[in-house]
Amino acid sequence: MPLVVKICGLSTRATLDAALAAGADMVGFVVFPASPRHVDLALARQLGDATGDRAAKVALTVDADDALLESVIETLRPDILQLHGHESAARVAEIRRTFGLPVMKVLGVASAADLAPLPDYAAVADRILFDARAPKGASRPGGLGAVFDWQLLRDLDLALPFMVSGGLTADNVAEAVRITGAGGVDISSGVETAPGVKDPDLIRAFIRAARASQELMI
């Protein structure tokens, strides 16, 4: 299966166009005011319309209530909901049932103990995204440029697709894919020059490196 490449936290037309032109499979839009990558609903609509069907649109929310999710879905018309907060497995199932969209649940990882909830989430989500667990007291759950121990996912037996994120760059994405066997990679801060400021050249370089990483495994 081709490696799925997601560029997350896009907030300008120029960087969105760069990601799409470079062949991103998924583009992520963050609706979470505490994040430097936050886009309001008006901008989300513009970026979603510009994306069209060239890539899957992913709406990232954090512990959102139904009212916010409904607004995001109506405005952005996403293909996937990314739940990046402390949503329980029951809440994931409820969101999936209520809104009828595929759900990608993010699981923060710092040690093997963080994988304990995985079976419960795998039973209700459509895709799992493993990210570095944010340190205690952090103002946001991801996009911090931190790497987790990929060896924790080696030989992972998971019946549904999974992706990895957290501190990825063009220089280390091949190793991340090789060790974890992930079917997809997700990057945000690794293609930025400052928090929330995406760089088209870094986006292109990352996507090239991600594609090359799969060729090396064939």
UniProtKB/Swiss-Prot annotation:
One Pfam family hit: PRAI
A GO MF term: phosphoribosylanthranilate isomerase activity
Keyword Transmembrane helix: no
Superkingdom, natural source: Bacteria
InterPro entries hit by this protein: Aldolase_TIM (IPR013785), PRAI_dom (IPR001240), RibuloseP-bd_barrel (IPR011060), TrpF_fam (IPR044643)
Reaction(s) catalysed by this chain's protein: N-(5-phospho-beta-D-ribosyl)anthranilate = 1-(2-carboxyphenylamino)-1-deoxy-D-ribulose 5-phosphate
Transmembrane domains' residue ranges: none
CDD domains xrefs: PRAI
Enzyme class, spelled out: isomerase
Pathway(s) per entry: Amino-acid biosynthesis; L-tryptophan biosynthesis; L-tryptophan from chorismate: step 3/5
GO BP annotations, alphabetical order: L-tryptophan biosynthetic process
Keyword list, A-Z: Amino-acid biosynthesis, Aromatic amino acid biosynthesis, Isomerase, Tryptophan biosynthesis
Entry EC number(s): 5.3.1.24
Membership in a protein family: Belongs to the TrpF family.
HAMAP family: PRAI
Protein name: N-(5'-phosphoribosyl)anthranilate isomerase
Gene that encodes it: trpF
